[in-house]
Amino acid sequence: MTIPLYTFVRGDSLGLILLVDEAHSIAEVATRAQRAAAMRVAPAARVGVYRAKVRLDPKLTVASAGLAPLDRIDILPEPLNGV
């Protein structure tokens, strides 16, 4: 099932509605969001996906993370050294 998500990539001047499949991993969602915003924001080497200020495990699927249509997610760059 396709789910539309309000997606905000740090540094982008626009919010995006990203269509994702419930079987996509959170890591795939992050990649797709960065590609969609790439004309305005250079993709970061490492990012976290957050919903309501809670970081989502990149291995979870959209469905297992409990994301619902029109939920907001934020894509935020993270340090490469993991700190």
PLM region spans:
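Ubiquitin system architectures
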Residues: M1-V83
